[in-house]
Amino acid sequence: MGRTVKVGSAGRFGPRYGLKIRRRVAAVEARMKQKHVCPVCGRKAVRRISTGIWQCQKCGATFAGGAYLPTTPAGKVAKRVVASKA
């Protein structure tokens, strides 16, 4: 008990890997587990189903994205390029 005060969900690693790494893991997991904006309906209801698979709880849209976030920096650039060509 008491291993998760500083590092949250990364407390499962115990004393291994160092505090900096465990804090980084906890930050990534916190962003991953929050609800994200749906690209189809615009609601903040997108949850991660599996690695890189995201689903909106409101409209049911399922789409591929990043492993930890629904949009990646490379995906944003690609979307911008496609929009400028159209």
UniProtKB/Swiss-Prot annotation:
Binds 1 zinc ion per subunit. GO terms for cellular component: ribonucleoprotein complex; ribosome. It holds the Pfam family Ribosomal_L37ae. Its cofactor is Zn(2+). Keywords: Metal-binding, Ribonucleoprotein, Ribosomal protein, RNA-binding, Zinc, Zinc-finger. Gene3D superfamilies: 2.20.25.30. GO terms for biological process: translation. A zinc finger (C4-type) spans 38-59. One of its GO terms (molecular function) is zinc ion binding. Belongs to the eukaryotic ribosomal protein eL43 family. This is Large ribosomal subunit protein eL43.
